[in-house]
UniProtKB/Swiss-Prot annotation:
Region called Disordered, residue ranges: 1-37, 378-402, 875-919, 1373-1463, 1702-1740, 1837-1923
Medical condition linked: Retinitis pigmentosa 86: A form of retinitis pigmentosa, a retinal dystrophy belonging to the group of pigmentary retinopathies. Retinitis pigmentosa is characterized by retinal pigment deposits visible on fundus examination and primary loss of rod photoreceptor cells followed by secondary loss of cone photoreceptors. Patients typically have night vision blindness and loss of midperipheral visual field. As their condition progresses, they lose their far peripheral visual field and eventually central vision as well. RP86 is an autosomal recessive form. A chromosomal aberration involving KIAA1549 is found in pilocytic astrocytoma. A tandem duplication of 2 Mb at 7q34 leads to the expression of a KIAA1549-BRAF fusion protein with a constitutive kinase activity and inducing cell transformation.
One Pfam family, short name: KIAA1549
Positions where Phosphoserine occurs in the chain: S1388, S1395, S1554, S1555, S1624
Gene responsible for this protein: KIAA1549
Phylogenetic lineage: Eukaryota, Metazoa, Chordata, Craniata, Vertebrata
Name this polypeptide is given: UPF0606 protein KIAA1549
Residue stretches spanning the membrane: 998-1018, 1299-1319
Function as written in the Swiss-Prot or TrEMBL entry: May play a role in photoreceptor function.
InterPro entries: KIAA1549 (IPR024606)
Natural source organism: Homo sapiens
Site (Breakpoint for translocation to form KIAA1549-BRAF fusion protein): P1643, S1644, S1749, R1750
Length: 1950
C-alpha cells in the first residue's frame, strides 16, 4: 500500500510512525486496487483493508469480491495508512470505491461488511501512540470475527496495533478474531486471513496480521463464537486496527488499541480515521467496526485512557457524502453517550469528521465515539480516569457516544460498561458475557452502572453489558449482584450489552482516544456497539438505539436509554464535525431524546444542519423518526449509507442488543449505502426504519440482541429488500447482521459471532431473513441466517425472554419514555415474539427464502412493525404481537439474542451453516435473556445456559449404579422421572459414565440444580425400589455439617418460578449475600462471605397461584471456613422480615434458623434453677415446629430484658437489659382446656451465671401479665413464671396479707410518730397556751369576738401566708411592736403558725395580752392619743374609725379610770372590742392600740404620773437590765432574724419577749394594769391579774431571753434590746412595717405627744430625769414591761388592726408629735442606746430623733421608710410636725402615762407576741414591731423606753391606741393617732395597705415613723404577705372595728 509499511507489532509499531496505507477507492469494483493496496500493505493491513474494501464492493473490484465476500464486496475500500499530520503519525485512510456499487445483494453486502471487519489499516500514532505508524490493518470479515477466544495474542495485537497493547485479545479473544468473511474480503485479504479469521489473516499478512493472527488462525473460532464479533471488536479495539465494520472497509483502530484503549493507538486510529475519514473511517455498515467496537470496546475500554487522547486526531472523514455526517454523527453519538457519563466523548468529533459517504468509516469513528462514550463512562463511576480521556475522545470521536450509548442502553449501564470495559479491556467475550449476565441480574439501567463499575474493576468480562445493566446497582460485586436482578429487562440487553460492553469498554478507552472507540464501545454492549460502529449517522442512531437497548428493558429503558444515548451521541456529534450532528440530543435524555440522537446522527450524516435539527428533536422523535427519519436521514445525508446506518441503528435499537444491532445495522446501512449507494430515499424508508426501530426496540429489550442479529442484516435487509432504501437497509442489515453478530458478540458475544457467521454463510439468507425479520424479526432472521439458529433463538428467547423479558418487558420506562419507545416496548415484547415467529419462519424458510419473503414480505411484516415505524414503534409491537405472541416475543427476544449469540459463534465458523448457530443462539438467547449472562455460555458457543456450567459442581449429580443397571436405560429412566416431575423435557449431560455416573440435567437453557434433581430421584423407584438401579445419589459438592446449616423459609414463590432452576438458586444466593452485606455494614463481622445453597424444597408442587412455603437450606462460608448456623442466624435476624424479603425478592416466612441451636447445661442437677411457664392456646402445629423452642427462648429473653429495663427505670437495675440468656429445657403438652403447653427453662445472666428459679421467676413476674402475653404471643396460665422445684409459692393473698401486716405495723408507728411530733410541737407552743389560761373567758370572748376579725385576718393571713387567723392578727400586732412584738411575735407567730393549738393560744393570748395591756395602755394611750392625736389628727382617722373609736373610747376611759386588774381591763377591752367586732381579738387590739395611743396616757396621766414615777424607778432599774437586755436582745434579735429568715424567727421572738419580762413584767404589768384598770375602769373591767398572769404566762411562754431581758432590765429593756437587735433586723423589719416607719418618722411619737401632750408633760414631770423623751423613757422603763406588754397587746391588736389606719394614724399622730418632742426633750444616751439597741423601739422611743435616727440607723429616714406610703409618711410627719412642739413636751408628760401604758403595752406586747406568731410576715412584723415600738418609744421615751411597750406606749401606744382610738374616737385618737390614722391608716386601708402591701413598703413605713411604722408595719405585714384587696379589706374591717372601739374607748377616756 502506498506509504504503508508492515511493522512488527512490537517495537516497529511503537517505535516509528507508520506509513499511511491508502486504499484508493476504485471506481466501483476496484477490487484490484484495494487488493493491491492490501498486497502492498502486508497482510496485516491488506487483509483488513481488503476486507473493508470487499465489504465495500464499490471500492474493491466487486467482481472478485462480490462473490467472495458478500459483505466485503459491498465496499471495496482502499486503506490509506497515512500519517496524520495533526493527530497521529500514521493514519489509515480507507477510501471507498464506488459506494454500494457492488452490493451483490444487500445480504451479500451485509456479509462483506461483516467480513470487512477491520480493514483497519491505520495506526493511531496519535498523541498516545505516535510510534504506531505501523500500517496495521485489521481486516476481518465480520463472519471471520469469531467469538472464539482466538483472541489476538497480545503480541499479535501488538503487531496489528503496535502502539496499542493488545489487551483486547484477552477480552476480545473471541471477538477480536473476527474473520472477514471470505466473500467480503478480497481474495488476497482473504488469503492472508482465514475466512473465519480473515481479519487475522490480514493482520498476519501485515503487521496487523499478527494482531489478527489469532483470528486468522482460528477461523473456526471466529465463526464459532457469536461473541466472535465481539472478540473481533476487541481486536479492533486497537486504535490502529480498523474496526471491521461490515459495511465499509473502515479502518478501525486495531483491536489492540481497543484493548489497550491506549490513547495513542486510538488517537492514531482516530487520526487515521480523521485523515482518511472517507477511507479510514469509512466503515461500510457492514464494517464491523461497531461490532468490533463491541468486542473492541471490551478491549478498548481498558485502554480507554489511551484512547482519550487520539479522539481529536482521528477523523473519520469519508470522502463520500458521509464525511461530515460521519463526523457529526460520531460526535453526536459520542456526545449522546457523553452527556450521561462522558461528555468527553464529544471531543473526538473533530478528529472523527468522516464524510457521510463513508458511513462505515463514520461507523468506525462511531466506534471511537463509542469509546468516547466509554470514556464518558469512565467519567462515570467506573472510568473516572478514562473519563477525562473520554473527554478528549469525545471531542475526537463524534460517534463514540453511540456505541457508548449502546452501552447506555441502560443509561447507567452503558456508561458503566465502558468504564468497566476500560478496566477490563481485555477480558474475554465470555467474561463480557458474564458481565452482561451480571448486568442482567442487575436488571436495571441503574444497576448497570453499578455493575459496570464492579466489572470494570474486576475484569472486562462482559464488562460493558454487566456494567451497564448491573454494576451501577451493585457496588460490591457486580457479578455477584448481577444475577441478583436478572428480572430487569436490562439484563438481556445487558447480556448483549455485556458483550458489547467489553468491546465498548475497550472502545471506551479508545473513545477517549477517538470517537471510533466510542462507537465500538456500544457495540460491545451489543446494542451500543452498533451505534459506535455505525457511521456517524449510524453511530448516532446506534447510540440512540444503543441507549434504548442498554436500558434495562429495551422498551422500558429504551426511552430512558434513548435519551441518555441520544444525549451522549448527539453531544458527541455536535461537538464534532457537525454541530447539527452534535445534536447532542443528549439534551433530550428522554427516550425521545435518544431517538432524536439517532436521527440527529443520521441527519448529521446526511446534513449536519439536519442533524442539528434532529438534535432538537425529542427522544420520541428520535424513536419514531429514528427509523423513519434516521433512515431517511441516512439516505439523504449519506445517500443511503448514512441513512442506512440510522436505520440499522434503529434496528439495533429495536433489538435489545440495540447497540450491537444498531451498530451492525448502522454499519450495514453504511455498507448498504456505500455499496448500494442507497439513497436517502431508500434509507428514508422511514416507516420501515422506524418500524424496525420499534421492533428493534422491543427486540432491544431482550430480543434486541436477537433482533440486532437479525435486524443487523435482517432488519436492514427488509429495507434493502424493499426499495433501494430497503435494500440499503438490508445491506446494512447484512452488515449489521455481521455487525449484529459482532454486536451480539459484544452484547451477546456468541450471538454476535453467530450472526456474523450467519451473515457470511448465508448472506442471501441473511438478506432474506432481514426483510422478513422486518425489524426485530428481520434482525432475528438475519441473525439466524441459518433458519435453525433462528428457531433456536426463538425457543430460547422465549424462555429467556420470560425471565429476562419479565424484566425487560415490564419496563414502562421504554413505553413511557417515548411513544415510539413505548410502542417499542410493547413492540419489544411483541417484537421479540415476532422475532421468534419470524425466526421460526426465517429459520425454516432459511435465509434465502426469508430474503424473498423478507424483502417484500417479511419486511412488510417488519414493515407492519417498521411500516408503522413512526407509529411503528407501536406497530412493531403490534407486528411483534402478530408475528409472534407478545409473550413469546418478549420471552424470545432476549433469549433469541442470546441464542443468536451462541449460534453466531457456532455459526460463525460454519458460515454456511446458520441452523447450528441458531441453536447455539438459542442457548445464548437463554443466556442473554437470563440474567445468567454470567454463565460462560457465551464463551462456550454452546447453547447459552442461563447459568455458568463451566464449573458445574453445583449442578452435577453423582450416582452409584447397581451392577445390573444399564447406563442407557438409566439415563432414559432418569430423564423420564425428571420429565414427569418437572413437567418438561430434560436433557442429561453426562460427565462420567464409569464407576460413578455423574451428570447434570438441563432443560433448554436452564440448568437444574443438583439438589433439585436429587430430591426427585431419591423419592423415585429408581432409588426406593426393592432392587434399586441407583444405589446412592449425592451432589458433587461438599455438604457441610448440620451445625453450619441455616434454614430460611419463603412464604411462596409464583408458579412461574421453578425452584429447581439454577437461576433461582443464584438469585437466592445473591439475595442472601446482599442481606449479609447489609447486616455486616452495621455489625462488625467477617467479610468475604459466600453463600452456598444446600437444599431447596417446596411443600406443594402443584401449580397454584402461590407455591410454598419454600424451605431454603444454606451455609455461609468465610475465609476461615463455614460459619456456625447460629452465628449466621443471629446475624441475619438483625434484619426485619420485610428487609430480608426485599433482599431475597420473595416474602419470607422465617428469616434464618440454625439447624442446631447451642445448648447450655440441661443437667437435672441444676433443676433448682428451672422455671416453669404455662402457655395457653398453643396449637399442635406450632408446637411441632422445630423453631418453636428457639422462638420461645428469644421471647423470654426479650421479656427479661424488658423487665430489667423497666427496673432500671424504677431504680438502677442490677440486671443488664438484653443480656440474659434463656435456655428452654423442655416443652411439653399439658392436659387441660385451651391447649396448655408447659415451658421449662432457666436463665443465665450476662456473666453466664445461672439465676436461681426463685430469682428468675421473681424477675419475670415483675412484668405485667398482659404485657408478657403480648411478648410471648400466647396467653399465660396463672403466674408468668414459677420455680419448678417449689411450685407452691406464697399466694397473692398471702402476699397481700403480709402487706397488710406491714401496713398495720408501719402505719400505726407512723401515726404515733406524727402524734408525738405534734405533741412535741404543741408542747413547744405551750407557752402560748399558757397565755390562754390567763383569761380563758377573754380568750373565748375574744375568739368569739375575733372570729370575724380572725376571719378577715385569716383571709389576710392566707394571703400573707400566715397559717392561722390568730397568727395573722398576731402578725399585725407584732408589726406595730417592732422589738417586743418581734420577740413575742416570733414565738407567738411560730407557735401560732406552727400548730393550730398555738394559733388558738396565740389568739387567746393575744386577746388577753391585748386586753390587759391594751386596755390599760389603750386607755392611757387612747386618752393621751385622743387628746393629742385627736387634736392633731382626729379627723380622718377617727372618722374612718369613728365607729370603733367610740367603742374603744369607752374602754379607754374605763381603763383610764383604772381597772384594778389587768384582766378586768382586758375583759373590758374585750367587751368593747366584741361589740364593734365580732372577734375580741380585734377589739382588744383596738383597745390596746387605743391604750397605746397617747389618748390613754392623758386619761392615765394622773395615775400614770404616779405610775410614771414608779415606772421611772422601774425604768431605772430596768434600764440597766434593759441595756444588758438590749444587748442580749440585739444579739438574740440577730439570731431571731436568722431564725426568722429560716422561718423560726417569730416564735423565738415571742418567747424572748414573754420570758424576758416575766417577773418584772408581771410586776410592772400589774402596776400598769392598775393604771390601766383605772383608765379602763369606765370602759372595761379587766383584772390586771389576768393580764399579769397572761403576761407571766406569756413571758413564760416566750423564750427565756425575755426573762433575761427582765433580768437585764425591764422586759421592755429586754425587748428593747431585742428590738434593737431586731432593729438591725429592724431595718429590714422597718421596711416591712410602715407603722414602724410612722413611729420612726416620729409621726406616731408626735401624735402621741399631741394627744399625750398633757400626759407627756405630766409624765415628763413625773420623769423629769429623763429628757422629755428620755425621762419619759426612763420612768416608763419600770412600767416598760407593762408598756411592753401593753405594747405587745397593742401590737397584737394593732396587727389585728394593722390594716386599719387607725393604728397607723395613731402612730402617725403620735409619731409626729413624739419625734419632735423626743428629739428635743428626751434623747437620753440611754434611750438612744436603747434605741440603738432596741432598734426601732428604743431609738424612736428615746427621741423623735431617735425614732428617726433609729430609722436612720436602719438607714432609712422615717419619711423615706413610709415613702412606700408617702401619704402615711408625710401625713405622719405632718402630724408630727403639727404636734412636734407640743408633742415633745407632752410627750415628756405623756411618757409617764405611756410608762403606765408601757406596762400595759408590755402586756399588750405579750399579747402581741402571740399575734406576731400568727403572722407569716413575722419578720416584717417583728421589724415593724421593733420599729414601731422604737418609734413609739422614741415618741414616749418615758414609759415606753423601759418597756418596749411602754416606750412605744407613748408614741406607740398612741399609735396603737390611735388605731384603737382612731377607731374608737375618730378625733380622740391622738391627734397624731388620728392624723396618722387618717393618712397612714386610711392609706393602708384604701391604698396604703395595698400599696404598702409589699414588704418593701412596710419597711419604708417602718422607717418613717415608729408609731406610723408600727401600724403600718402591722398593716404592712398583712400587706406584704397578702397585698391583695381582700387582705386590705379584711384589715380595714378589723381596723374599722378597732378604730371604732378605740374611738369609743378614747372618747370614754377623754
Amino acid at each position: 500500500m502506498p506509504g504503508a509499511r508492515r511493522r512488527r507489532r512490537g517495537a516497529a509499531m511503537e517505535g516509528k510512525p507508520r506509513a499511511g496505507v491508502a486504499l484508493a477507492p476504485g471506481p466501483s469494483g476496484r477490487r484490484p486496487s484495494a487488493r493491491c493496496a492490501r498486497r502492498r500493505r502486508p497482510g496485516l493491513l491488506l487483509p483488513g483493508l481488503w476486507l473493508l474494501l470487499l465489504a465495500r464492493p464499490a471500492s474493491c473490484a466487486p467482481d472478485e469480491l462480490s462473490p467472495e465476500q458478500h459483505n466485503l464486496s459491498l465496499y471495496s475500500m482502499e486503506l490509506v495508512l497515512k500519517k496524520s499530520t495533526g493527530h497521529s503519525a500514521a493514519q489509515v485512510a480507507l477510501t471507498e470505491t464506488a459506494p454500494g456499487s457492488q452490493h451483490s445483494s444487500p445480504l451479500h453486502v451485509t456479509a462483506p461488511p461483516s467480513a470487512t471487519t477491520f480493514d483497519t489499516a491505520f495506526f493511531n500514532q496519535g498523541k498516545q501512540t505516535k510510534s504506531t505508524a505501523d500500517p496495521s490493518i485489521f481486516v476481518a470479515t465480520y463472519v471471520s470475527v469469531t467469538s472464539k477466544e482466538v483472541a489476538v495474542n497480545d503480541d499479535e495485537m501488538d503487531n496489528f496495533l503496535p502502539d496499542t497493547h493488545w489487551t483486547t485479545p484477552r477480552m476480545v479473544s473471541p471477538i477480536q478474531y473476527i474473520t472477514v468473511s471470505p466473500p467480503g474480503l478480497p481474495r488476497e485479504a482473504l488469503e492472508p486471513m482465514l475466512t473465519p479469521s480473515l481479519p487475522m489473516v490480514s493482520l498476519q499478512d501485515e503487521e496487523v496480521t499478527s494482531g489478527w493472527q489469532n483470528t486468522t488462525r482460528q477461523p473456526a473460532a471466529y465463526a464459532e463464537s457469536a461473541s466472535h464479533f465481539h472478540t473481533f471488536r476487541s481486536a479492533f479495539r486497537t486504535s490502529e486496527g480498523i474496526v471491521p465494520t461490515p459495511g465499509r472497509n473502515l479502518v478501525l483502530y486495531p483491536t489492540d488499541a481497543y484493548s489497550h484503549l491506549s490513547s495513542r493507538t486510538l488517537p492514531e486510529i482516530v487520526a487515521s480515521l480523521t485523515e482518511g475519514v472517507e477511507t479510514t473511517l469509512f466503515l461500510s455498515s457492514r464494517s464491523l467496526m461497531p461490532q468490533p467496537l463491541g468486542d473492541g470496546i471490551t478491549i478498548p475500554l481498558p485502554s480507554l485512557g489511551e484512547v482519550s487522547q487520539p479522539p481529536e486526531e482521528v477523523w473519520a472523514t469519508s470522502a463520500d457524502r458521509y464525511t461530515d455526517v460521519t463526523t457529526v454523527l460520531s460526535q453526536s453519538l459520542e456526545e449522546t453517550i457523553s452527556p450521561r457519563t462522558y461528555p468527553t466523548v464529544t471531543a473526538s468529533h473533530a478528529a472523527l469528521a468522516f464524510s457521510r459517504t463513508h458511513s462505515p468509516l463514520l461507523s468506525t469513528p462511531l466506534a471511537f465515539a463509542s469509546s468516547a462514550s466509554p470514556t464518558d463512562v469512565s467519567s462515570n463511576p467506573f472510568l473516572p480516569s478514562d473519563s477525562s480521556k473520554t473527554s478528549e475522545l469525545h471531542s475526537n470521536s463524534a460517534l463514540p457516544g453511540p456505541v457508548d450509548n449502546t452501552h447506555i442502553l441502560s443509561p447507567v449501564s452503558s456508561f458503566r460498561p465502558y468504564t468497566w470495559c476500560a478496566a477490563c479491556t481485555v477480558p474475554s467475550p465470555q467474561q463480557v458475557l458474564a458481565t452482561s449476565l451480571m448486568e442482567k441480574d442487575v436488571g436495571s439501567g441503574d444497576g448497570a452502572e453499578t455493575l459496570c463499575m464492579t466489572v470494570l474493576e474486576e475484569s472486562s468480562i462482559s464488562l460493558m453489558s454487566s456494567v451497564v445493566a448491573d454494576f451501577s446497582e451493585f457496588e460490591e460485586d457486580p457479578q455477584v449482584f448481577n444475577t441478583l436482578f436478572p428480572s430487569r429487562p436490562i439484563v438481556p440487553l445487558s447480556s448483549r450489552s455485556m458483550e458489547i460492553s467489553e468491546t465498548s469498554v475497550g472502545i471506551s478507552a479508545e473513545v477517549d482516544m477517538s470517537s471510533v472507540t466510542t462507537t465500538q464501545v456500544p457495540p460491545a454492549h451489543g446494542r451500543l456497539s452498533v451505534p459506535a460502529s455505525l457511521d456517524p449517522t449510524a453511530g448516532s442512531l446506534s447510540v440512540a438505539e444503543t441507549q434504548v437497548t442498554p436500558s434495562s428493558v429495551t422498551t422500558a429503558f429504551f426511552s430512558v436509554i434513548t435519551s441518555i444515548l441520544l444525549d451522549s451521541s448527539f453531544s458527541v456529534i455536535a461537538n464534532k464535525n457537525t454541530p447539527s450532528l452534535a445534536v447532542r440530543d443528549p439534551s433530550v435524555f428522554t427516550p425521545y431524546s435518544l431517538v432524536p440522537s439517532v436521527e440527529s446522527s443520521l441527519f448529521s450524516d446526511q446534513e449536519r444542519s439536519s442533524f442539528s435539527e434532529h438534535k432538537p428533536r425529542g427522544a420520541l422523535d428520535f424513536a419514531s423518526s429514528f427509523f423513519s427519519t434516521p433512515p431517511l436521514e441516512l439516505s439523504g445525508s449519506i445517500s443511503s449509507p448514512s441513512e442506512a446506518p440510522a436505520s440499522l441503528s434503529l434496528m439495533p435499537s429495536d433489538l435489545s442488543p440495540f447497540t450491537s444491532q444498531s451498530f451492525s445495522p448502522l454499519v450495514e446501512t453504511f455498507t448498504l449505502f456505500d455499496s448500494s449507494d442507497l439513497q436517502s430515499s431508500q434509507l428514508s424508508l422511514p416507516s420501515s426504519t422506524n418500524l424496525e426501530f420499534s421492533q428493534l426496540q422491543p427486540s432491544s429489550e431482550l430480543p434486541l440482541n436477537t433482533i440486532m442479529l437479525l435486524p443487523s442484516r435482517s432488519e436492514v435487509s427488509p429495507w434493502s429488500s424493499f426499495p433501494s432504501d430497503s435494500l440499503e437497509f438490508v445491506e446494512a442489515s447484512t452488515v449489521s447482521l455481521t455487525d449484529s453478530e459482532a454486536h451480539f458478540t459484544s452484547a451477546f458475544i456468541e450471538t454476535t459471532s453467530y450472526l456474523e457467521s450467519s451473515l457470511i454463510s448465508h448472506e442471501s439468507a441473511v438478506t432474506a431473513l432481514v426483510p422478513p425479520g422486518s425489524e426485530s424479526f428481520d434482525i432475528l432472521t438475519a441473525g439466524i441466517q441459518a433458519t435453525s439458529p433462528l428457531t433456536t433463538v426463538h425457543t430460547t428467547p422465549i424462555l429467556t425472554e420470560s425471565s429476562l423479558f419479565s424484566t425487560l418487558t415490564p419496563p414502562d420506562d421504554q413505553i413511557s419514555a417515548l411513544d415510539g419507545h413505548v410502542s417499542v416496548l410493547a413492540s419489544f415484547s411483541k417484537a421479540i415474539p415476532t422475532g421468534t415467529v419470524l425466526i421460526t419462519d426465517a429459520y425454516l424458510p432459511s435465509g434465502s427464502s426469508f430474503v424473498s419473503e423478507a424483502t417484500p414480505f417479511p419486511l412488510p411484516t417488519e414493515l407492519t412493525v417498521v411500516g408503522p415505524s413512526l407509529t411503528p414503534t407501536e406497530v412493531p409491537l403490534n407486528t411483534s404481537t402478530e408475528v409472534s405472541t407478545t409473550s413469546t416475543g418478549a420471552a424470545t427476544g432476549g433469549p433469541l439474542d442470546s441464542t443468536l449469540m451462541g449460534d453466531a459463534a457456532s455459526q460463525s465458523p460454519p458460515e454456511s451453516s446458520a441452523a447450528p448457530p441458531l441453536p447455539s443462539l438459542r442457548p445464548v438467547t437463554a443466556f442473554t435473556l437470563e440474567a445468567t449472562v454470567d454463565t460462560p455460555t457465551l464463551a462456550t458457543a454452546k447453547p447459552p445456559y442461563v447459568c455458568d456450567i463451566t464449573v458445574p459442581d453445583a449442578y452435577l449429580i453423582t450416582t452409584v449404579l447397581a451392577r445390573r443397571a444399564v447406563q442407557e436405560y438409566i439415563i432414559t429412566a432418569i430423564k423420564e422421572v425428571l420429565r414427569i416431575h418437572f413437567n418438561r423435557a430434560v436433557e442429561l449431560k453426562v460427565y462420567e459414565l464409569f464407576t460413578d455416573f455423574t451428570f447434570l440435567v438441563t432443560s433448554g437453557p436452564f440448568v437444574y440444580t443438583a439438589i433439585s434433581v436429587i430430591n426427585v430421584l431419591i423419592n423415585s423407584k429408581l432409588v426406593r425400589d426393592q432392587t434399586p438401579l441407583i444405589l446412592s445419589v449425592k451432589p458433587s459438592f461438599l455438604v457441610p455439617e448440620s451445625r453450619f446449616q441455616v434454614q430460611t423459609v419463603l412464604q411462596f414463590v409464583p408458579p412461574s418460578v421453578d425452584t429447581g432452576f439454577c437461576n433461582f438458586t443464584q438469585r437466592i444466593e445473591k439475595g442472601l449475600m446482599t442481606a449479609l452485606f447489609e447486616v455486616r455494614k452495621h455489625h462488625q463481622g467477617t467479610y468475604n462471605l459466600t453463600v452456598q445453597i444446600l437444599n431447596i424444597t417446596i411443600s406443594s408442587s402443584r401449580v397454584t397461584p402461590r407455591r410454598g412455603p419454600v424451605n431454603i437450606i444454606f451455609a455461609v462460608k468465610s475465609t476461615q471456613g463455614f460459619l456456625n448456623g447460629s452465628e449466621v442466624s443471629e446475624l441475619l435476624r438483625n434484619l426485619s422480615v420485610v428487609e430480608f424479603s426485599f433482599y431475597l425478592g420473595y416474602p419470607v416466612l422465617q428469616i434464618a434458623e440454625p439447624f442446631q441451636y447451642p445448648q447450655l447445661n440441661l443437667s437435672q442437677l441444676l433443676k433448682s434453677s428451672w422455671v416453669r411457664t404455662v402457655l395457653l392456646g398453643v396449637m399442635e402445629k406450632q408446637l411441632q415446629n422445630e423453631v418453636f423452642q428457639a422462638e420461645m427462648e428469644r421471647k423470654l429473653a426479650q421479656l427479661l430484658s424488658e423487665v430489667s429495663t423497666r427496673r432500671r427505670m424504677w431504680r438502677r437495675a442490677t440486671v443488664a437489659a438484653g443480656n440474659s440468656v434463656v435456655q428452654v429445657v423442655n416443652v411439653s403438652r399439658l392436659e387441660g382446656d385451651d391447649n396448655p403447653v408447659q415451658l421449662i427453662y432457666f436463665v443465665e445472666d450476662q456473666d453466664g451465671e445461672r439465676l436461681s428459679a426463685v430469682k428468675s421467676s421473681d424477675l419475670i413476674n415483675k412484668m405485667d401479665l398482659q404485657r408478657a402475653a403480648i411478648i410471648l404471643g400466647y396467653r399465660i396460665q396463672g403466674v408468668i413464671a414459677q420455680p419448678v422445684d417449689r411450685v407452691k409459692r406464697p399466694s397473692p393473698e398471702s402476699q397481700s396479707n403480709n402487706l397488710w401486716v406491714i401496713v398495720g405495723v408501719v402505719i400505726p408507728v407512723l401515726v404515733v410518730m406524727v402524734i408525738v411530733v405534734i405533741l412535741y410541737w404543741k408542747l413547744c407552743r405551750t407557752d402560748k397556751l399558757d397565755f390562754q389560761p390567763d383569761t380563758v373567758a377573754n380568750i373565748q370572748q375574744r375568739q368569739k369576738l375575733q372570729i370575724p376579725s380572725v376571719k378577715g385576718f385569716d383571709f389576710a393571713k392566707q394571703h400573707l401566708g400566715q397559717h392561722n387567723k390568730d397568727d395573722i392578727l398576731i402578725i399585725h400586732e407584732p408589726a406595730p411592736l417592732p422589738g417586743p412584738l418581734k420577740d413575742h411575735t416570733t414565738p407567738s407567730e411560730n407557735g401560732d403558725v406552727p400548730s393550730p393549738k398555738s394559733k388558738i393560744p396565740s389568739k387567746n393570748v393575744r386577746h388577753r395580752g391585748r386586753v390587759s395591756p391594751s386596755d390599760a395602755d389603750s386607755t392611757v394611750s387612747e386618752e393621751s392619743s385622743e387628746r393629742d392625736a385627736g387634736d392633731k389628727t382626729p379627723g380622718a382617722v377617727n372618722d374612718g374609725r369613728s365607729h370603733r373609736a367610740p367603742q374603744s373610747g369607752p374602754p379607754l376611759p374605763s381603763s383610764g379610770n383604772e381597772q384594778h386588774s389587768s384582766a378586768s381591763i382586758f375583759e373590758h377591752v374585750d367587751r368593747i372590742s366584741r361589740p364593734p367586732e365580732a372577734s375580741r381579738r380585734v377589739p382588744s387590739k383596738i383597745q390596746l392600740i387605743a391604750m397605746q395611743p397617747i389618748p390613754a396616757p392623758p386619761v392615765q396621766r394622773p395615775s400614770p404620773a404616779d405610775r410614771v414615777a414608779e415606772s421611772n424607778k422601774i425604768n431605772k432599774e430596768i434600764q440597766t437590765a434593759l441595756r444588758h437586755k438590749s444587748e442580749i436582745e440585739h444579739h438574740r434579735n440577730k439570731i431571731r432574724l436568722r431564725a426568722k429568715r429560716r422561718g423560726h424567727y417569730e416564735f423565738p421572738v415571742v418567747d424572748d419577749l414573754s420570758s424576758g419580762d416575766t417577773k418584772e413584767r408581771h410586776r410592772v404589768y400589774r402596776r400598769a394594769q392598775m393604771q390601766i384598770d383605772k383608765i379602763l375602769d369606765p370602759t372595761a373591767s379587766v383584772p390586771s391579774v389576768f393580764i399579769e398572769p397572761r403576761k407571766s404566762s406569756r413571758i413564760k411562754r416566750s423564750p427565756k431571753p425575755r426573762r433575761k431581758h427582765q433580768v437585764n432590765g425591764c422586759p421592755a429593756d429586754a425587748e428593747k434590746d431585742r428590738l434593737i437587735t431586731t432593729d438591725s433586723d429592724g431595718t429590714y423589719r422597718r421596711p416591712p412595717g410602715v407603722h414602724n416607719s410612722a413611729y420612726i418618722g416620729c409621726p406616731s411619737d408626735p401624735d402621741l405627744p399631741a394627744d399625750v401632750q398633757t400626759p407627756s408633760s405630766v409624765e415628763l414631770g413625773r420623769y423629769p430625769a429623763l429628757p422629755f423623751p428620755a425621762s419619759q423613757y426612763i420612768p416608763p422603763q419600770p412600767s416598760i414591761e407593762e408598756a411592753r406588754q401593753t405594747m405587745h397587746s397593742l401590737l397584737d391588736d394593732a396587727f389585728a388592726l394593722v390594716a386599719p389606719s387607725s393604728q397607723p394614724a395613731s402612730t402617725a399622730g403620735v409619731g409626729p408629735g413624739v419625734p419632735p418632742g423626743l428629739p428635743a426633750n428626751s434623747t437620753p444616751s440611754q434611750e438612744e442606746r436603747r434605741a440603738t439597741q432596741w432598734g426601732s423601739f428604743y431609738s424612736p422611743a428615746q427621741t423623735a430623733n431617735n425614732p428617726c435616727s433609729r430609722y436612720e440607723d436602719y438607714g432609712m429616714t422615717p419619711p423615706t421608710g413610709p415613702l412606700p406610703r408617702p401619704g402615711f409618711g408625710p401625713g405622719l410627719l405632718q402630724s408630727t410636725e403639727l404636734v412636734p412642739p407640743d408633742p415633745q413636751q407632752p410627750q415628756a408628760s405623756a411618757e409617764a402615762p405611756f410608762a403606765a401604758r408601757g406596762i400595759y403595752s408590755e402586756e399588750m406586747p405579750s399579747v402581741a407576741r402571740p399575734r406576731p406568731v400568727g403572722g407569716t410576715t413575722g419578720s416584717q412584723i417583728q421589724h415593724l414591731t421593733q420599729v414601731g415600738i422604737a418609734s413609739r418609744i422614741g415618741a414616749q421615751p418615758v414609759e415606753i423606753p423601759p418597756s418596749r411597750g411602754s416606750q412605744y406606749g407613748g408614741p406607740g401606744w398612741p399609735s396603737y391606741g390611735e388605731d384603737e382610738a382612731g377607731r374608737r374616737e375618730a378625733t380622740h385618737m391622738l391627734g397624731h393617732q388620728e392624723y396618722s390614722s387618717s393618712p397612714l391608716f386610711q392609706v393602708p386601708r384604701t391604698s396604703g395597705r395595698e400599696p404598702s402591701a409589699p414588704s418593701g413598703n412596710l419597711p419604708h413605713r417602718g422607717l418613717q415613723g415608729p408609731g406610723l411604722g408600727y401600724p403600718t408595719s402591722s398593716t404592712e405585714d398583712l400587706q406584704p404577705g397578702h397585698s391583695s384587696a381582700s387582705l386590705i379589706k379584711a384589715i380595714r374591717e378589723e381596723l374599722l372595728r378597732l378604730s371604732q372601739k378605740q374611738s369609743t374607748v378614747q372618747n370614754f377616756h377623754s
